[in-house]
C-alpha cells in the first residue's frame, strides 16, 4: 500500500488551530505513506516527508514537528511519553483495561527513522542513511516532545508564536519546561520509564495530544530535507505498561529495516539451525583440484543414513 500526497502553501486563517495561523512560507511537502504485507512489519506503517524551500528566503532556526492526537480506544484514559535516546514518542492506556480494547490495550508510537541533516564540516560527525553514511553531517533527531493540554501556555497551537514555542521545546508562552523529578530545564516531557513508572512519567489519565520536534536547522532557498517516520502499534508486552517496552523494541526493528532500505522482509538476525554441537571436524586433502571433474570428495557423518549421489 502506498499513498502519495503533494502539498504546497496556501493562505489559511489563524483560527485553524494546528497550522498556527502562519502565512505561506513557500514550502513544498511531498508525502509518501507506505507499508509492507509481511509479518515482521505487519504492525507498522511509514511516512516519508520531503520538504523543499521553494521561496527565495533563508529559513533560519527551522523545526519540523509531528503532531499526533492518538486515542487508545476511549480517549479519556490515555497517557503519553517519550524516549529521547530512541527518538520515539508514544501513547498508551493509563489503565490495563479499556472500554474498546478490553484488557491489555496496545501502545502506539512514532519514531524518527530519519530526521533533518545538518552540515558541520567535522569529520568526527556522521549521519547514517539507508544508502550511505555521510561524513561531516549530523542528524537533529527528536529534539523535544511536548504534551499539549488545556491552559494558556500549554493549550492548543492556535497562533504562530505559540506553535513555534512548542516546536522549540518550550511552553506556548516561551517559558522553559521543567522536569518535575530533576528540577532542571528540559525539552522532553515525560521522558522517564513508562514501563516501570520511574523517573518523570505521565501520572494521570486523560485525552492526550503530543508534539514531537526536530531542529533547529537552516534551509537555504532550494534546499531539501527528508524526514521518515514509523508509526507502530503493539500489545505484545502483556499489559498496558509493558506494551510500551514492546513498542520500543519494535521501533528498533523498524530502524534496522529502514537502514537496510527495506530490501528484505525476513527477520533481521541469526536464527539457530540446530542445537547439536560438533564433537570435532577434519578437513580432508581433496587432491587434485576440486574443480577437476575426476576428483572424488571424501566425507563422513556420525549416523548411518543413506546418502544420494
Residue ranges and their predicted role:
Residues 44-46, 232-267:
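Terminal connector regions
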Residues 51-56, 233:
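Asparagine-centered strand-capping/turn motif at beta-strand->loop junctions
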Residues 60-203:
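Glycine-rich (often Gly-Gly/Gly-Pro-rich) flexible segments and glycine-rich loop motifs
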Residues 218-232:
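Short Pro-Gly-centered flexible turn/kink motifs
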Residues 271-287, 291-309:
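Glycine-centered coil/turn sites that cap beta-strands in beta-rich domains
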